[in-house]
Amino acid sequence: SLQPASKSALASSWKTLAKDAATIQNNGATLFSLLFKQFPDTRNYFTHFGNMSDAEMKTTGVGKAHSMAVFAGIGSMIDSMDDADCMNGLALKLSRNHIQRKIGASRFGEMRQVFPNFLDEALGGGASGDVKGAWDALLAYLQDNKQAQAL
């Protein structure tokens, strides 16, 4: 489970990352752009994006909708950090959704690798080590849960 300091860092950074719909849409597109640049083959899982450019991911209905959906899921996690049963249920739901798409736990590891750069970009040039560590702890929890579901 997440430590109190991590919960605090997640909650405070989330207020900036998900300030409003436009911020969410921009940050979602940024996150997936970084993922696709560092791990180009991950784009194969997102056929609904087609050959969309980074700019199009920020401006088209499909791109904006995906950002909103992903950030809604993350927001549910942030809102449930003090409810272990709910967190486990959300992680299970996330795992099942990704297993259906044949997205394994190693792909969650790729997202973990991209996330520090995303935080630097989305939080205006430098997320603290505490913030990066907190997000890594949350993503590690999701990755570990994903591995357990695949067994």
Swiss-Prot record:
Subunit details: Homodimer.
Record flagged with keyword Metal-binding: yes
Pfam family, one: Globin
Modified residues (N-acetylserine): S1
Domain of life the protein comes from: Eukaryota
CDD domains, per database record: Mb-like (cd01040)
Protein name, UniProt field: Globin
Alphabetical UniProt keywords: Acetylation, Heme, Iron, Metal-binding, Muscle protein, Oxygen transport, Transport
Keyword Metal-binding included in the entry's annotation: yes
Protein species of origin: Cerithidea rhizophorarum (Water snail)
Positions with a binding annotation for heme b: H66, H98
UniProt domain Globin: residue ranges: 1-151
Family: Belongs to the globin family.
Annotated GO CC locations: extracellular region; hemoglobin complex
InterPro entries found in the cross-reference section: Erythrocruorin, Globin, Globin-like_sf, Globin/Proto, Mb-like_M
GO molecular function, one term: heme binding
